[in-house]
Amino acid sequence: MMQDSIDFGTMNIPKLFRMMFIPTLLGMVLSATINIADGIFVGRGVGNDALAAVNIVAPFFMLATGIGLMFGVGASIVASIHLSHQKVKVANINITQALSVSLCIMLSLSLLVMTFRAEVALLLGSSEQLLPSVLEYMNWIVPFLAFYMLLNIGLFIIRLDGSPTYAMLCSAIPALINLTLDYIFVFPLHWGLMGAALASAISVIVGSIMIVVYIVGFSKVLHLYRPKFSLKSILLTIRNIGYMVKLGSSAFLTEAAIACMMLVGNYIFMRYLGEDGVAAYSVACYCFPIVFMVNNAIAQSIQPIISYNYGIQQWKRVRQAFKLALLCAVVCGGLACVGTILFCPKVSSLFLGNHGNAYEIAISGIPYFSLGYVFFALNIVCIWYYQSIERFKPATLFTILRGIVIITLSFMYLPVVCGIKGIWLAVPLSELITFVIIVVYYLLKRTRA
């Protein structure tokens, strides 16, 4: 079992960040890259309508990941602070509560969605033409959403336990399994959307098994704690879960924001450009997770460092870690923007072929979409910073503004002002406005202090 020697309270911050960031980044980027390969297989092996159908169902992935992040972040922050005070038993109780309650929630939601599949598909923006494909994909994805959630929570626990390299493997190995099975199921076996969904389900089950094996058999500090069912224990669990949800709510809302971006975007693209517009938009939505994963890797790597040192009031180390994360965010966001603009035609052709209306829509619009990457990167790091120091109110407010309120208004009104170009600029505008709000908030707080 791969375990790393990490001390969050004394190690050099750049070295500590590097030890956390590199394996986290590799695991996340590989996972996002495989997700793109999945889209390519579906687009080229099944067709543009199938690709659009996957994009319709994509908010479910965001939901499962969001719940996983909410409980994972909340439990990680609380456990980090307890560990900094040598309260190992309390930290173990927290992670056990987070895992058990989140599994109950996700299983209940999956059952509810499967009961009303057609209604939910139409609510997500499916047209009658896409509905059969959407339902086929849902049938093989929704029952396994709990495994997606478990994988996300488990990664936080393993990194906090001091094993970021093994956490990377928990992302990388399922991603490679997904890639292999995707190709086999879609091309040689011709299983279509069912094959693509089944490949994803099998891979995430493998990842979840790896998580459970580590926590049960190889964890150094963090272990599952046998739950108690007395009235006092239940009330304490409710209190602890409520606090973890508060701390992790902005992480959930970040995923919900991506789901909102897809959902509202699907509606607007369908309204203005039809199925071809949704297919073109799905290329941006498939590529966007790489940008998201890179910046999420920065934030998730810095979170235990900030939370631990916040717990022991080492503010100099907290500020040093935050500044380092901001610098990485600017560099990564800038590179992503330039790369998207330069390679947009090649990437779009992988999904859609190099001809047709959907391809033309994609290559003309995606460069505009990429202009918001730097501001997105900065916003993610700032929001995670506030989460990590238990400032959940501003973190939640900024997430709601950028991911739900401003982006919805931008999608609604920018096309009226700027035409089709305005649809693609809706996301960059919402990120820019949010960043300005965060900077103003920070300056006002610093002035008052």
Where do the protein language model's features map onto the residues?
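Transmembrane helix-bundle signature of multi-pass secondary active exporters and lipid flippases
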Residues: 24-77, 141-148, 242-309, 329-336, ...
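Alpha-helical transmembrane segments of multipass membrane proteins
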Residues: 36-40, 111, 119, 153-157, ...
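Hydrophobic side chains within alpha-helical segments
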Residues: 38-41, 162, 181, 185, ...
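Short alpha-helical transmembrane segments in multi-pass integral membrane proteins
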Residues: 1-21, 79-144, 188-248, 306-372, ...
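Helix-loop interface residues and adjacent transmembrane-helix termini in multi-pass membrane transporters
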Residues: 33-36, 45-48, 82-85, 160-161, ...
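Short runs within selected transmembrane alpha-helices of multi-pass transporters and secretion channels
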Residues: 72, 141-159, 167-178, 196-211, ...
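Small-residue-rich hydrophobic transmembrane alpha-helices
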Residues: 51-111, 148-167, 280-338, 342-344, ...
